[in-house]
UniProtKB/Swiss-Prot annotation:
SUPFAM superfamilies: Ribosomal protein S18 (SSF46911). Binds as a heterodimer with protein bS6 to the central domain of the 16S rRNA, where it helps stabilize the platform of the 30S subunit. The gene is rpsR. The keyword Membrane does not apply. It comes from Bacillus cereus (strain ATCC 14579 / DSM 31 / CCUG 7414 / JCM 2152 / NBRC 15305 / NCIMB 9373 / NCTC 2599 / NRRL B-3711). This is Small ribosomal subunit protein bS18.
Length: 77
């Protein structure tokens, strides 16, 4: 098989929270959490969003808490 020619170079994604100086992810901030949930209601992985491992863990906990408090739906619409 021949190697791939051309194409675009992949750009490194920057962590949203590190870039904006956000240190605490609040489960009550539904608008922020919705950015990291798919239209089906699943938590988007790091390779899609570009968040760092530290903030991905905090984000997951915040989304799960928001779901438990009925601020976010478990399933998409």
């Amino acid at each position: 098989m021949a190697g791939r020619k051309g194409g675009r170079a992949k750009r490194r994604k920057v962590c949203f929270f590190t870039a904006n100086g956000i240190t605490r992810i609040d489960y009550k901030d539904v608008d922020l959490l919705k950015r990291f949930v798919s239209e089906r209601g699943k938590i988007l992985p790091r390779r899609v969003t570009g968040t760092s491992a530290k903030y991905q863990r905090k984000l997951t906990v915040a989304i799960k808490r928001a779901r438990q408090m009925a601020l976010l739906p478990y399933v998409g619409e």
